[in-house]
Amino acid sequence: MEQLSSANSLFALELFHTLSESSPTGNIFFSPFSISSALAMVFLGTKGTTAAQLSKTFHFDSVEDVHSRFQSLNAEVSKRGASHTLKLANRLYGEKTYNFLPEFLTSTQKMYGADLAPVDFQHASEDARKEINQWVKGQTEGKIPELLAVGVVDSMTKLVLVNAIYFKGMWEEKFMKQDTTDAPFRLNKKNTKSVKMMYQKKKFFFGYISDLKCKVLEMPYQGGELSMVILLPEDIEDESTGLKKIEEQITLEKLREWTKRENLENIDVHVKLPRFKIEESYILNSNLGRLGLQDLFNSSKADLSGMSGSRDLFISKIVHKAFVEVNEEGTEAAAATAGIATFCMLLPEEEFTADHPFIFFIRHNPTANVLFLGRVCSP
């Protein structure tokens, strides 16, 4: 499981960098876990160079028996009875006249719980699009009502592969609504906007990375299996959002080092965190292309013969939409598709005032998997 968590987290950071390059000062929010799961299903049906590129981009090449690892991980992450709601759902929508290989369909069902729903892309692509959107809307409690925009599928579409993830968690320590006030949020050195700033003082895991002048705060959700971890620079020191230095330095080893419990102290923290709601939509072809995944999107080069026995399939688009809302009660999120840090002595009480841009992720603690990763530049 650890190999797969590392592979997924490494991919998460690499994709974060490409999204940040495309939008240097914008909000970012996505589910690397959802994207990796969806492309692992594609990986089942790829061969040759296409398979090699996919394996390298997602670091599946460092994981033994990747599909059964995903099977265990998906089961572990979406265990029933937890005090949060975390739902994963996969489904394949295939052109009903097209012959997919039975062994491909058996494997996606067994490893990813993904059934094939036959639809009529050829003669009724708009109906098929609506059906897919309706399913995703149901899986994400209405938070992602339209995954596929008009025109994304057409009469030539053979396969749409959908992964949806939905999360709703209550803070272990809730903020009191009466403590929320209007406060300025600094977007950069010059501009501010007014936000609803929540406040509480409780014991939290807190750390400080001195070479980056950055605070680390872990806020657990009820049940303790999931946490939101926030990286907040002490101040805005660059001409942009103030996150440049962290973004340039962040690696998987460092992120683990900075955010693991042993390196944090459980102390009283005055937490000020804005309420925020982010909805992002990405077509990931060019971002994944920059990470080395190219043949998959090229009709003359893609080899998905493990799905159909022939070479006539390719993936035209990878669409990912994600939604997160953070308030006094907790968080609702959905998505469809090592230098050792030196920690310094902390005071008995610390201030954590998120009144300027920060990076955050939602982690499944038992498996150390990053389920969602984001950056708040303008709440």
UniProtKB/Swiss-Prot annotation:
Keywords from the UniProt entry: Cytoplasm, Endosome, Lysosome, Phosphoprotein, Protease inhibitor, Secreted, Serine protease inhibitor
- Keyword flag Ubl conjugation: no
Location relative to the cell: Secreted; Cytoplasm; Cytolytic granule; Early endosome
User: Does the entry feature the keyword Secreted, yes or no?
Assistant: yes
The cross-references to Pfam families, in alphabetical order and at most eight, read: Serpin (PF00079)
Q: Where is this site: Reactive bond?
A: 344-345
The Phosphoserine modification is found at: 300
The record's annotation in SMART domains points to: SERPIN (SM00093)
Which is one GO molecular function term here?
peptidase inhibitor activity
A single Gene Ontology CC annotation of this entry is: early endosome
Biological processes annotated in GO: cellular homeostasis; inflammatory response; negative regulation of cell migration; negative regulation of interleukin-1 beta production; regulation of innate immune response; regulation of protein catabolic process; type B pancreatic cell proliferation
Checking SUPFAM superfamilies in the record gives:
Serpins (SSF56574)
Could you tell me the superkingdom of the organism this chain comes from? Answer: Eukaryota
Q: What does this protein do?
A: Regulates the activity of the neutrophil proteases.
Member of which family?
Belongs to the serpin family. Ov-serpin subfamily.
Please describe the quaternary structure of this protein: Monomer.
This protein is called Leukocyte elastase inhibitor A
Q: Which organism is it from?
A: Rattus norvegicus (Rat)
